[in-house]
Amino acid sequence: MLDIKWIRENPEALDAALAKRGAEPLAQTLVALDEKRRSAVQKTQDLLSRRNAASKEIGAAMAQKNAELAEKLKAEVAEIKETLPAAEEEERTLSAELIDALSRIPNVPFDDVPVGKDEHDNAVARIVGEKPRWNHTPREHFEIGEALGYMDFERAAKLSGSRFTVLTGPLARLERALGQFMIDLHTREHGYTEVSSPLMVRAEAVFGTGSLPKFEEDLFKTTDGRYLIPTAEVTLTNLVREEILDQEKLPLRFTALTPSFRSEAGSAGRDTRGMLRQHQFWKCELVSITDAESSIAEHERMTACAEEVLKRLGLHFRTMTLCTGDMGFGSRKTYDLEVWLPGQNAFREISSCSVCGDFQARRMNARYRGKDDKNNKFVHTLNGSGTAVGRCLIAVLENYLNEDGSVTIPDVLLPYMGGLTKIERAA
């Protein structure tokens, strides 16, 4: 959430940022609403101040035996008591309206973010590795998995409907191996602390990271009002909600390997075959909590940590700087890692790493104190996939496919595969 004080002082900057995202100007509307709220706050404060002053004056009048003045003041206090509830309700209503309006406004992109409309305007930051060179024809992951006999979409549909997958045998083990490899890498070498956290959260947590209220249709909601997490970003970031941290203990770096749940409400007709776009999928999430001065450098570090996963798996990928029209709601800058999928003859997103500044922290009221600071400051938050496990499995299947239809296990995963070096067709 943006700072209304900043908006009051920089209305043109807000509208310019919204224009970069393809949104209509809102500064004038927000400032007008804030002026009404501030006027209501002042009215309430004036009434309270006058009530307190009049109450003291009653005592003084009675001490002076001025009964007429005392009765007049009592009548004034009684009138204020009748007026005050309506004034307080108006203040609460206008404050809630302002918070709701602010909560629907996206973050302000950094100046170095390319301006564009959609994914076609994203910029290549770097390319790592090369496309595999084969004599055989590439195949898509679902063709490979079904031919091997370990990827079952029919039974998944019988159990749960569309956009679910059942993996069995060595493919189930490969999925588990990928997740374990990612967690081990990030905790042992990258300095992240592993967290096991709930998969269901309160609305306040989803609001804190920015999915509510604007993107509720993308979420799964339980009958008691909780939400299934769309990503462990929600739980990991909200660990510091409503806390004041010591600056010297920052940054905090958290990681978790969890299922993620998404309705894919806006994805009708997209990636309907296979397991590229699922309602439920495993993902290794990275979250950093920093001070205001360190977040940009931390963003580069986090992205490098995610890239290392793909490098060690020997996968060809590119890192993209997302344009203003393609970046997420809460982000100030985002790098997407896109892995090469030979079966699709295309790069596809496998990780997204974003720096959010204090946007989420304001929603969560998460702050830190410095040694010499009189006032607490909002933390900066970052999140990234390190990486999506299912999409990584897809990449391994398509890039390590052999001519006979078997799939070679990448060397870095061998310690997790119980002696298996190749996945071959089920007998």
Curated annotation (Swiss-Prot):
The protein's matches in SUPFAM superfamilies, at most eight in alphabetical order, are given as:
Class II aaRS and biotin synthetases, tRNA-binding arm
Task: Give the function comment from the record.
Answer: Catalyzes the attachment of serine to tRNA(Ser). Is also able to aminoacylate tRNA(Sec) with serine, to form the misacylated tRNA L-seryl-tRNA(Sec), which will be further converted into selenocysteinyl-tRNA(Sec).
The species this protein was found in:
Rhizobium etli (strain ATCC 51251 / DSM 11541 / JCM 21823 / NBRC 15573 / CFN 42)
Instruction: Return the domain comment text from this UniProt entry.
Output: Consists of two distinct domains, a catalytic core and a N-terminal extension that is involved in tRNA binding.
Question: Its annotated pathway?
Answer: Aminoacyl-tRNA biosynthesis; selenocysteinyl-tRNA(Sec) biosynthesis; L-seryl-tRNA(Sec) from L-serine and tRNA(Sec): step 1/1
Please state where this protein is localized.
Answer: Cytoplasm
Report the principal subcellular site: cytoplasm
InterPro entries attached to this UniProt entry: aa-tRNA-synt_IIb, aa-tRNA-synth_II, aa-tRNA-synth_II/BPL/LPL, Ser-tRNA-ligase_type_1, Ser-tRNA-synth_1_N, SerRS_1_N_sf, SerRS_core, tRNA-bd_arm
Q: Which domain of life is it from?
A: Bacteria
Binding residue positions for L-serine: 231-233, 285, 385
Protein's UniProt name: Serine--tRNA ligase
